[in-house]
């Protein structure tokens, strides 16, 4: 293990050296810190029971790093070929030496202007990629994200907008809802060779076909993006999905971006998904499941406004209703704001207020969580997006669970309680 880690460190050091020796681009993201919880022990994250995201400020408990290296490998006129990569790490920030295997998040090649005469400005790409992801920064919620291994052509200039076509895959490894049979030989108690058929499990391959039409000018400083994603599951010959598995589904997305919006921007998003696309509601598909037949409706409004040269604010409103045929769906309500007051160009104070509610489809019961964070921050510039940043924070959260209570109590908490967290964190992107 030590040799493995040493070789990895040498490889990264070599790549870092290459950034100064050749035209290699080095980008990335990182966060880390230390925190304490009023109930004792290390910092704990405050997240609504049944929810998939949380308001981030003063509420992140892991060390997370993405290291991106890329280089233009070919350039001729307007044509160019770019190699991009991304290795990610995540540890619990508990001790000095925390060993973890890296995750290869991206490795792809992008050929810009590959068909300059026929498709000017279009890019042909293939490989693993973060593909045109859309998210709410405050709670790290990726509402449109089909990232994975794939291929496509993007930014085809149609004159009135840009068209992108892609296919990506997310495989369900050894999915429990996928079956086949193997003939197995064995020796019985009498020493005779016998045979029987045993059930086996195998992967389910979910392909997502993505069509996007972006940069549609619909009003002054306003642009519309329209997307359609179709997910379809398939298996190897000799295997089959469990009866009732969703197998396929689709998701439709409309996103309006308003620029020059009170000194910032506003995004309004409407999404509708069916069946296999309702498991995560992001654009990824889970066709092996028998528990995701149904539909989802989501509305999001988020952005940034600048009230004065001294004050900026992030905001987010989310409504998501998933109605499932088995009555196991949920409705998610979320609202948050993060105002920032700038004392000078490199020092600021931030407050984040976040509220999440999950309503159970079958019982109508609700789980709630509210949190407030006060943070003093030193950052590289006077924008709310300025990074790197070092922040000292205090966070107070209160929750009240009415269903799936054991998910909370099994983790050592009461169904209705509160917690105070304090700590120091840095965050950087470059």
UniProtKB/Swiss-Prot annotation:
The record marks 142 as: Important in sugar transport. Homotrimer formed of three 18-stranded antiparallel beta-barrels, containing three independent channels. One of its GO terms (molecular function) is maltodextrin transmembrane transporter activity. This is Maltoporin. NCBIfam families: PRK09360.1. It is found in: Cell outer membrane. It comes from the Bacteria. It comes from Actinobacillus succinogenes (strain ATCC 55618 / DSM 22257 / CCUG 43843 / 130Z). The record marks 29, 64, 97, 265, 385, 429 as: Greasy slide, important in sugar transport. It catalyses: beta-maltose(in) = beta-maltose(out). It is a multi-pass membrane protein. GO terms for biological process: monoatomic ion transport. Belongs to the porin LamB (TC 1.B.3) family. Residues 1-23 form the signal peptide. Involved in the transport of maltose and maltodextrins. HAMAP family: LamB. Keywords: Cell outer membrane, Ion transport, Membrane, Porin, Signal, Sugar transport, Transmembrane, Transmembrane beta strand, Transport. GO terms for cellular component: cell outer membrane; pore complex. Induction: By maltose. Pfam families: LamB.
